[in-house]
A protein has these predicted regions:
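Beta-rich strand-turn-strand
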Residues: 66-75, 80-89
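Charge-rich (acidic/polar
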Residues: 13-19, 55, 87-88, 92
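Short, structured motif recognition centered on aromatic/hydrophobic residues
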Residues: 1, 5, 30, 74-78, ...
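Short conserved catalytic/interaction loops centered on acidic-Pro-aromatic/His motifs
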Residues: 84-106, 112-113
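Short, basic amphipathic alpha-helical segments that act as recognition/interaction helices
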Residues: 21-28, 33-36, 100-109
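A positional/architectural concept
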Residues: 3-27
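Short, Lys/Arg-rich amphipathic alpha-helical interaction segments
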Residues: 106-134
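Helix-adjacent hinge/juxtasegments
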Residues: 29-67
Length: 134
């Protein structure tokens, strides 16, 4: 775990991380345990526990979660099946994404995620519209 992320976790007394495959990208997501608990509570608050489909959604969402501990040297062991899910073979890259950390195969981040022109246009659209949902 890179030092800047470790410092933030230590400052917030986070000792465990929740690991999950990203829903949309070929990467893994590390949540500080408190952030994961908040996100899980939000999801559960939107689900009806008496609706079988909602129970399937919750089950699917939490089924691939792994709890990781960070050792004294800032290391954590990511299980092999997660590395395979994210196509990670050698070098990895950590990307801070607001209140969570994405873990990528470095070779997947060597190119921009979006073409610069597409990115600038999309960002302009998001930042200049009253409803930022498209």
């Amino acid at each position: 775990m890179p030092m800047p992320f470790r410092k933030l976790l230590q400052e917030n007394a986070e000792e465990r991380m929740i690991l999950k495959k990203d829903l949309y990208q070929t990467c893994l997501v590390l949540y500080p345990e408190s952030i994961w608990n908040n996100e899980l509570q939000e999801l559960k608050s939107r689900l009806n526990k008496w609706d079988p489909k909602h129970q399937l959604i919750l089950r699917q969402y939490v089924s691939d979660v792994e709890i990781l501990s960070i050792d004294i040297n800032g290391r954590m062991l990511i299980p092999k099946r997660y590395l395979e899910m994210a196509s990670i073979q050698n070098d990895i890259r950590f990307i801070g994404m607001d209140d969570k950390i994405e873990v990528w195969a470095k070779n997947l981040t060597d190119q921009p995620f979006m073409h610069p022109k597409d990115f600038s246009e999309a960002l302009k659209n998001v930042m200049t519209k009253e409803n930022n949902y498209e």
